[in-house]
Amino acid sequence: EIETKTDKKSRKGNKKEAGSGRKKKKSGFKRFLIAVALILVFLAAGLYVLVGKVYAEMNYEEIESVASSPMKEEGVTNILLIGNDSRENGEDGRSDAMILLSISNKTKKIYMTSLLRDMYVEIPGHKDNRLNAAYSYGGAELLMETIEQNFDIHISRYVLVNFEAFANLVDAVGGVDLELTGKEVEYVNGYLVEYNILLGRPEGTDYFDDLSGGMVHLNGPQALAYCRNRYIGTDFGRTERQRKVLTEVIHKLPKGVLTNPKGLIDGLMPNLTTNLTQAECYRLSLMAPKILTYDIIPVSYTHLTLPTNREV
């Protein structure tokens, strides 16, 4: 067939239209990427503002001796969780619970290591004493220094909560479901007698009527009472109960953030003290969706190997 001038013009026109279509597609894809980037920037900015507002509710306490230390070392973030036993009846404010939270990006695991409060250790600048005495002598700074000196575990960040914060945290995520023995249920009721008096709550508040045990739903005060029981299984059983409750709370935390953010902020933050900076809290918030998918490993303290390959 003989191609006419009209056919040639038509073919050239089709090529131009095809090229123009590809340019439009590329241009459209670029606009899409720019839009996605802008959305991410706005979300990040919004998250930063939110973290700033939440951070303002916390109690920040800088520790100069570790301020320049990085939060993360060798892919592992170590944060010391301290439960402070400081109540209105004049107790000395020793650390009632100490759990080392080690987040390993390499193994994709969260290691929870309970440090027994009655361990006899060397306390820098003081006579040998129980580990929990270090906090009453010199606060979180001396406690971290004591742990590092005795166990060769470097810790530069901590989070301190009081009893009220712990109970509020459990309530904010909707409570926890755990298997309790009848004896453990009885102890919960016994501790609630003291708790209700301290907080001015009516006698009998949150008591269990059924003392047979089994799968039990615990609210905040009940979970706190369960964790403080050191008469069943001594301090080993006590720290195991603490890890059980904390594990359940971590599992329920993502849903709690979505369904009850105000409860978490109002109930926890004013009762929390930390040396984590706002920038570090922001980085942790960005990592949170990934971290909360990690397996949680309760570490044995009879032969302890941390993600840093150090042993205790």
PLM regions with names:
Residues Y137-R201, K255, N275-C281:
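Amphipathic, coiled-coil-like alpha-helical scaffolding segments used for oligomerization/assembly
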Residues T302-T308:
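Conserved small/polar residues in nucleotide/adenosyl-binding loops
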Residues A97, D128, A140-E148, F163-A167, ...:
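Extracytoplasmic/secreted envelope proteins and their assembly/folding machinery
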Residues E74-T77, G93-M98, T107-I110, L115, ...:
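Extracytoplasmic
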Residues E91, D171-N260:
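Flexible, polar/acidic helix-loop-strand segments at domain edges
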Residues K23, S27-K108:
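Entry/capping segment at the start of metal-dependent catalytic domains
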Residues E88-N89, N129-Y137, D152-R157, R228-G237, ...:
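Second-shell loop/turn segments in exported
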Residues E1-S20:
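N-terminal targeting leaders characterized by basic, low-complexity, disordered sequences
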